[in-house]
Design a protein with these regions (language model features):
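A structural motif corresponding to the C-terminal end of an alpha-helix
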Residues: 84-97, 182-200, 239-262
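Short, well-ordered beta-to-alpha junction loops that form the rim of enzyme active sites
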Residues: 203-207, 262-265
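The substrate-binding groove and active-site-proximal loops of carbohydrate-active enzymes
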Residues: 167-179, 234-235, 280
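Serine-esterase "nucleophile elbow" of acetyl-processing enzymes
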Residues: 2-102, 123-125, 151-155
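Histidine-centered active-site loop/cap adjacent to the catalytic His
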Residues: 273-305
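Substrate-gating cap/lid alpha-helix
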Residues: 210-261, 286
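Oxyanion-hole/transition-state-stabilizing segment in secreted/luminal serine hydrolases
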Residues: 112-175, 207-216
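Short amphipathic alpha-helices and their capping/turn segments at secondary-structure boundaries
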Residues: 22-35, 111-132, 185-197
Length: 305
């Protein structure tokens, strides 16, 4: 086996993991588990939440569960951060390995012309026995919206009744159906253009933490305020729910099984302990998300032991 990856270096990267480290982790995984599936994570910080979490190294916070075996093989020292990938590996055990290729602070529209390097890694390495989990698009609204997105979100948040959102009659919803269905389909199609995996799990984002639920400062406070979330959280929540129904549940990739997952069923905006900065999954939030995802992944693994 090749050299192990320096754990501090592996988690130091803000935007995803360094490609060299990912390549090393992938090689170690293949050497350790050549016949087992890899679960690739693609998208944004809803899956790449490591930056917001405490270290498990001395001076940090102790893990509440044993370190999954794959980290003992890949990291030196074997002290992973308890991010979404960690919890997936905890639940999956030796049956499959989760590998995080999602990128913090990345956008869906960034991928319109060219894939990110992390996406290209997935495209070039994913196999027929593997699975792909995608969660992307939230930063196009909350972090760096373009002018068109801002206009449609303001129309939806301030000039549209909740009842029209819930009925699907709100005209601004069409814009976001294009984003979360058509644009996500194009993105996923690029990821699987060389090899089609066993299945793709496409996620709709969770609800942000409600202002009334717990006091947390957030980089997204201004955006959440502009969207009316601090005053009427139910309105944005209704929009996310409807976008799941009209967009995520309708995603289709020719020749591929697509399973929609509503992360807001797990992170519902009511519990401060599930969040960091109101919009990032905490250790506990990531654990809950991983548990939800594994419930979908387990049947797809079939007889893998």
């Amino acid at each position: 086996m090749g050299n192990k990856i320096n754990a501090s270096q592996f988690y130091f990267e803000y935007k995803g993991h360094a490609i060299l480290d990912i390549s090393a982790f992938h090689s170690i995984t293949i050497s350790q588990r050549p016949t087992k599936p890899i679960v690739y994570l693609a998208g944004d910080s809803s899956l790449d939440n490591k930056f917001w979490l405490p270290s498990s190294s001395p001076g940090g916070e102790r893990l509440t569960v044993a370190v999954p075996e794959i980290y003992k093989a890949a990291l030196k020292p074997p002290r992973p951060k308890p991010d979404v990938a960690f919890w997936l590996n905890h639940y999956l055990g030796s049956r499959a390995t989760a590998l995080n290729l999602a990128v913090e602070a990345s956008l869906l529209r960034e991928r319109n012309s060219d894939l990110l390097a992390h996406d290209e890694f997935i495209r070039d390495h994913i196999r027929a026995e593997d699975l792909l989990v995608v969660s992307v698009g939230a930063n196009d609204i909350a972090m760096r919206p373009n002018l068109s997105t801002i206009c449609h979100m303001l129309l939806l948040a301030w000039l549209t009744s909740t009842s029209r959102i819930q009925s699907g009659a709100a005209l601004p919803l069409r814009y976001f159906v294009n984003m979360f269905k058509t644009q996500v389909e194009k993105y996923v199609a690029k990821l699987v253009e060389k090899h089609k995996p066993r299945a793709v799990v496409v996620c709709m984002i969770y609800f942000p933490l409600e202002a009334q639920a717990a006091k947390q400062d957030s980089w997204a406070d201004a955006s959440l305020g502009a969207l009316g979330y601090n005053r009427w959280p139910h309105r944005l929540q209704a929009a996310i729910t409807k976008m799941y129904e009209l967009a995520t549940q309708k995603v289709q990739i020719p020749g591929l099984s697509v399973i929609p997952v509503a992360l807001f069923e797990t992170l519902d905006g009511k519990r401060g302990g599930d969040y960091v900065q109101r919009v990032e999954p905490s250790v506990e939030g990531g654990r809950k998300m991983a548990s939800q995802l594994v419930a979908v992944i387990n049947p797809l693994l079939g007889t893998v032991e």
